[in-house]
Amino acid sequence: MAVPARRTSKAKKNKRRTHYKVTAPSVNFDETTGDYSRSHRVSLKGYYKGRKITKAASAE
């Protein structure tokens, strides 16, 4: 098995880890329902791009 020739320094390790981050989800205001929903997804009331796609989710 291959073994690293030198130990990875703290700076090198931390620079590599700077790319591991969480991005906030994009949320848009839906004018049809008056609610906020995520992009490219059907809203809880069953609308997508202002058109009715499915029945609204029931709260059972």
From Swiss-Prot:
PANTHER family reported for this sequence: 50S RIBOSOMAL PROTEIN L32 (PTHR35534), LARGE RIBOSOMAL SUBUNIT PROTEIN BL32 (PTHR35534:SF1)
GO terms classed as biological process: translation
Gene Ontology molecular functions: structural constituent of ribosome
Record flagged with keyword Nucleotide-binding: no
Transmembrane segments: none
Originating organism: Streptococcus pneumoniae serotype 4 (strain ATCC BAA-334 / TIGR4)
GO cellular component labels: large ribosomal subunit
UniProt keyword list: Ribonucleoprotein, Ribosomal protein
Protein name: Large ribosomal subunit protein bL32
Any Pfam family hit: Ribosomal_L32p
Family in the record: Belongs to the bacterial ribosomal protein bL32 family.
